[in-house]
Every structure is written in C-alpha cells, then in structure tokens.
C-alpha cells in the first residue's frame, strides 16, 4: 500500500500531522466490519444535495481510510478537520462530505463524537469512514483534505487514488 502524506507547510502552522496508510472502498459498511450503531444517524452528502439516513448508508458504498494521526501541538484533536473533496475542472474543490464513521468514537449521538484525546507528540492509528456514491463522483479525483475552511496556504490535499 502506498503511504500518502499531506504536503508539509510552514512548520509553526502545523498542529496535526497525518499519514493515510490505506484507502479502501467497500460495497457497504458491513463488508468493512462497521456496525449500524457506529455510523452517524444522519449523514450530510452535499455533493448531490441529500441527507442520507443510517439505513440508506448501510446499503451504500463506504470509503474507509486507515490514518495515523500525530498531535504536533493541538489542544483539541477532532476528526472533523478531515473532509473528502473532489477536484473538478480547473482544480475546483467540490466538497463531498464529512466523516460518518470513526473507529475511536464512542457514542454517535454525543456532540463529542469526533473528539479524541491525544497529547502533544502522541500518535494514534484510526479508521475514518465516509458514505460515498461512486456514481456521483470521479473516484480518481477524490482527495482527503484538512482545514477545508481555513486558508488555502494551510490546507493539504492527499490524492487517494481510488
């Protein structure tokens, strides 16, 4: 498996460093060993302008990323920084969605679901999942990004090469 890391930027602006060890598109969450109660109850899928229920997601493809995360100097570690995007014409960034599954998450109903304790200089390996509709996007142009709403100079893109 090719390991993919984000481009390195200005070191003082890096709070979390991560490596995508593996990206796998499964036919459904069950194939990925993800149970229904581990998936967010309502999944926003802005690419096609729909909200996806857990029941729908259980019968839909799921992208699972195996990611190693290292806390460089962040006070609050939160997987919501990770977003899927598709790069369209002229490298236009089209948001696909937020994670709907997180291996370290405890309670999908909790507002703290996406948070994880990780002290500076510590690392954790985790699995992060997204509902994805392969008919609605070009799999070869899907990227993992961080800091999507921040400045472009602080945003990294990792081509998942699906």
Language model regions located:
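Conserved functional micro-motifs across diverse proteins
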Residues: 1-162
């Amino acid at each position: 498996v090719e390991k993919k890391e984000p481009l390195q930027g200005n070191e003082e602006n890096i709070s979390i460093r991560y490596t995508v060890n593996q990206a796998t598109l499964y036919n459904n969450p069950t194939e990925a060993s993800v149970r229904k109660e581990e998936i967010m109850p309502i999944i926003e899928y802005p690419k096609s302008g729909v909200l996806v229920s857990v029941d729908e997601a259980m019968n839909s493809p799921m992208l699972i990323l195996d990611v190693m995360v290292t806390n460089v100097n962040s006070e609050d570690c939160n997987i919501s920084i990770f977003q899927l995007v598709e790069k369209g014409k002229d490298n236009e960034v089209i948001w696909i969605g937020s994670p709907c599954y997180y291996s370290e998450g405890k309670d999908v109903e909790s507002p703290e679901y996406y948070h994880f304790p990780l002290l500076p200089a510590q690392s954790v390996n985790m699995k992060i999942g997204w509902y994805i509709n392969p008919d609605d996007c070009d799999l070869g142009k899907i990227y993992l990004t961080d800091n999507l709403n921040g400045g472009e100079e602080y945003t990294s893109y990792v081509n998942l090469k699906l």
